[in-house]
Structures are given as C-alpha cells and as structure tokens.
C-alpha cells in the first residue's frame, strides 16, 4: 500500500538502529550511479537514467520493488500537463520533510520555471562543507554530483525522505 497506509500499520520507530540509516544508504547508493548516461525515461545504473529514473533505481536498491508503474512521459510533460504529477508521486511514497531539516539521502524537488509544475528531482548527497551537494541526472549528459548553489536553492520547492522501513 501507500506510505500513508504503511505508516498507519507500522511502528513509528521503523526498523534499523537510527534515523539516518536509510538516508546514508540512499546517499551511498546514489554515488554508485555517478557517470550513468542521461537517457529519458531510463532507470538502469551504468546504462541510462533521467532524474526520476535515478530515484526509481535508488528505491529498487534500498526498498525493493517499485511501488507503482510510471506511464510514458515526454520531456516537456510539466509544461504540457499543469498537474504536479512528480510531487504527487513523491508524496505517495516518500515522507515530506522541511527544507531546513534536509539531510543526506533526501530527495529534492525543483520547479524550473514559474507557473510550471515541478519537474526535476535530485538526491542530497552531502550537507557539510561550504554548501550542500546533490546527485542528479543532468539533462543530455549523465548522473553527476554538483554543488547546490544559489541557482538550485531558488528553485527548490520540496524535500522528501525515504521511509525508515525501506
């Protein structure tokens, strides 16, 4: 079932020895995707991935089978559709967290243009240092790790965390 259903039937503490367990696993797993070529709609480490494909692949590695199928989508789906489809999917399966409480392993959601649905996601890979770092599928290139500079921070609209039972 959905995260809401799982939360209602599972202990609040989840499993594992601490709250950072799943986030640390996600961040480590994301680094293994670095260099994976950008491929629209793909989700295969070392072969191809887009931003959603990276998150889907990390889910498979950390939590198991994907919880729902992803219908085909065009590169301009956010501009054409108007609905917050990516945000809605993340809200179904991940736990929303405040931007101030973000930690490594959290999934970040970005809105690239005002008035358009949020359409890019990344994984926060490090919070220490001069500014945070993130791992994401860079359009037309590859999965990369980059600084989350001012340009990205201005476009950040939400953050989500993998459930502890993952």
What is each of the regions a protein language model found here?
Residues 1-19:
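Intrinsic disorder/low-complexity segments
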Residues 20-27, 68-144:
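...with weaker cross-activation on analogous glycine-rich loops/strands in unrelated enzymes
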Residues 20-36, 147-166:
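Non-catalytic ligand/cofactor/substrate-binding and regulatory segments of enzyme domains
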Residues 34, 59-63, 126:
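Hydrophobic/aromatic-lined pockets within catalytic cores
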Residues 38, 93-98, 155-158:
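Short secondary-structure junctions
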Residues 38-43, 66-71:
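Surface-exposed patches in mature extracellular/periplasmic domains of secreted proteins
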Residues 43-62:
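Active-site nucleophilic cysteine motif
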Residues 45, 129, 141, 163-166:
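Residue-level detector of flexible, active-site-proximal loop/helix-junction positions
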